[in-house]
Curated annotation (Swiss-Prot):
Chief place of localization: plastid
Pfam families according to UniProt: Ribosomal_S8
Name by which UniProt lists this protein: Small ribosomal subunit protein uS8c
Keyword Nucleotide-binding: no
Name of the coding gene: rps8
Amino acid sequence: MGKDTIADIITSIRNAQMAKKGTVRIASTNLTENVVKILLREGFIENVRKHRESNKDFLVLTLRHRRTRKGIYRTILKRISRPGLRIYSNYQGIPKILGGIGIVIVSTSRGIMTDREARLQGIGGEMLCYIC
C-alpha cells in the first residue's frame, strides 16, 4: 500500500481478478469509500462491508461473478490522473469510455462522481480513473 490510494484500489481489484479471488480487502479512507460507493452503485462490485482490525478500518469488496460461469466478471480499470501528472478537464472534455458504456470517476468541487453526473451538473475536475 503506497500513498496513491486510487492506484491501490485498482491494483488490488485487478490482482484479485487475475488470481480468481472473490473478495478484496483495501484500506478505508474517505476517498476510497467514495470511489467504492460509485463502483457499487454502477454494478462493478457486488457488495461492500467495513471491517475493523487492530484500530485500522478496512473495506472488504465482493467482486461481481458471471451468472453462467464460475469466474469473476472481468472489468478494465485504469488510472488516469496520478500524483506525478494530474489530469484536469472541464465537463465538455471528459471522455466517453466505450461510447458511454464505461465510466470515468471524476473528483469535483462537489465531491467524487461519475462522468455522467459531472456532465449533467456542468462541472469538471480531476479525472481519477476509468472503468469499463
